[in-house]
């Protein structure tokens, strides 16, 4: 912590730097990048099947600005958390170099894993570098609040009138996907029932599961940031109803976990009197009733909801359990590959694209799992989680990341932009807020 605080003081004391045009331009790029990746993450086109989104372009521009400044000024000052993030990226860079040399998979196959594991973590680095004041964090969170409002509005309009009627090519849906098919949303694994053309609500994310995972990640933070109690409760209600409307079973489980965490926090809160606990329990008890009425307006979603939580479907993990079991059996037989993973180096059986941790084991083994989860857990435990009793926003960040870590066992959407970007963005905001709080105590 002391080393991180020294690094923090060196950065926040750069008055001339903060007044420079370079810094102001970098901040503008950063703010645009954050807003786009939360609000319009699919804006852009595809080149050779690889998404070239506006959010990715602004992220790369921001990283380039950071990189040029570090080289130009020889400012090689990194906090402990940043070092862990960079070490994780270095591991994955080396691992994918071996993948490339192995020649068993083509560039178009492994680049989709490379970018989220090697490039997107630098979101944390650049945000930590360019954010030097608490008011910048406040501005970003306000920006994200209005961004999620836009996402909610698009989603509800699509659910009511049809996705095709409320889609803007190149902005709310990738332009290449849009022109390739008039039924593009049905081709993105958005069906809610076999043989039924009704699609999950996708809003501006183009995929129901991707939408659900991302709003679970950052909406708890935004909810806690709202000062007015009435508006905060309205936001929570809209958030819950929107999660139901996504049609994503992963999102449904995630919102249940989030509400369960909220209940535990309320009951264990030392200052909570009996009336507050009773009121909280009453509100939570009403949620299934409101949800049932809401689902009655969307019979396809209701049918999916009833079919989703049978023993057979839970055990099947939405069709993922068979390939996951095959991968586990592979590691039992080929234990020599458990450390670094077989991907691109040898033949293997089984797969686990959606299940983030099993996919990471396939790509980089246990070492890869440590390289990915290690920095996240370090930031979560030593920084954001340490101050949750002092800051509602940090509490929301911690809850959102914990929910993501849990649901990523089944559906992490890690390989689809903007999940990894938003994950590191939320962690960066929590980490930086923790440092500001430590600094204010001095």
Place the predicted regions along the sequence by residue.
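A membrane-periplasm/extracellular boundary helix in multi-pass inner-membrane enzymes
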Residues: 153, 157-163, 246, 266-311, ...
